[in-house]
């Protein structure tokens, strides 16, 4: 007879694999729209709305799959160790979306200024246009993020403060749930049981309740991620939003690949002794 827990974990992992494949597909679509100098805001907006809807669908599926076994999402076996070390409530911190905006803005501004001062083969008007962000076609490639206005930066900073505050509230709830495991009945039962880990109906009920509460926390965290993502996109122009989403998806997939590479190097360095870790695909 198959283990229901194993079946559910497979569903969770399949859901994740589908999500990662979808990210790769959206990257291709966004890059194509940006690289071809697509000036049709409606087309870009359709891609942006699709990307937002993708995350909403993924969060809904995660919620359904976490009702009985939510702990799988807080240290997923399908993630690399690097990714799990960076997890916050089963995913990335919503405030990291905003940090990505700041990083892209700063990087592209520096890039343009460097081009302005180093590009001595062009006349001053050409250099000035480049520094001001007047790129050919006025489209993406990351350059659009250096065109953020003072009003946009103010709104993003305001959103950053509110997001961090919301994160802190959820972190406090998580800390409280973790502390509950060192309280009655779990800790007391562990102390008095002659056989360590011996089955206990009361403990199982308490752990089921803990898992249920953690599942609720995951849902709230995903809601905050969704809200933050949507508000950032609302602040940005269509081109900026496309650049931002492209950067976020590339970072997500890159962290997974970097994590696998690091684990592979460690495995080789240890002479093939994985220390009990499962080889990740």
UniProtKB/Swiss-Prot annotation:
Segments carrying the region annotation (Disordered) are 262-281
Q: Which Pfam families match?
A: DOG1
Q: What happens when the gene is disrupted?
A: No germination phenotype.
Molecular function GO labels = sequence-specific DNA binding
Check the record and name the InterPro entries matching this protein. Answer: Seed_Dev/Stress_Resp_Reg, TGA_domain
Gene Ontology annotations of biological process type: DNA-templated transcription
Domain of life, per the record?
A: Eukaryota
**What range(s) does the DOG1 domain occupy?**
9-265
Stated name of the protein: Protein DOG1-like 1
